[in-house]
Amino acid sequence: MQGPAVNIGVLLFIPYRHMEDRILKAVRDSGFDDLTLAQARVFQRIAPGGSRLTDLAEQAQMAKQSVAGLVDELERMHYVRRVPDPDDRRARLIKIAARGQRAAEVAQAAHDQIRSEWRVHLGARRFDQLQATLEELREITDPFTATPPA
């Protein structure tokens, strides 16, 4: 007899957590061993052109003060830098610094390796279907997506 089905949210979370753990391990093993999981979760949300603190807090679903503390730590460790926001003189943008860029490159390589492993495990067709399905589901679940649902 088969037990109850595992909650779909858990099924989505398990591979995410696996990927997150492996990426953070790869980053730490590459010499960025001062980076914590909480810092990495904020760091990964920084937009290519920089992000405002309030946007990072909203996306991380954390208090602005908590994110500010993490960004302060990231800045002290030279992963990020604060620069004036060209659109608003009163605001500052958090941008990825050179050290952060090097860590991000390691993270991207680890991400690519994991995707490759999953593609082999599932097969190309099923992996592509999974990717397409998750992108479609994102349309109705991600409040930060560039294209809001119709």
Where are these regions (language model features)?
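N-terminal helix-turn-helix DNA-binding core of bacterial DNA-binding proteins
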Residues: 21-66
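N-terminal leader segment of winged-helix/HTH proteins
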Residues: 1-34
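Charged, amphipathic alpha-helical coiled-coil/dimerization segments
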Residues: 25, 72-135, 139
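Short, charged, intrinsically disordered terminal tails
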Residues: 142-150
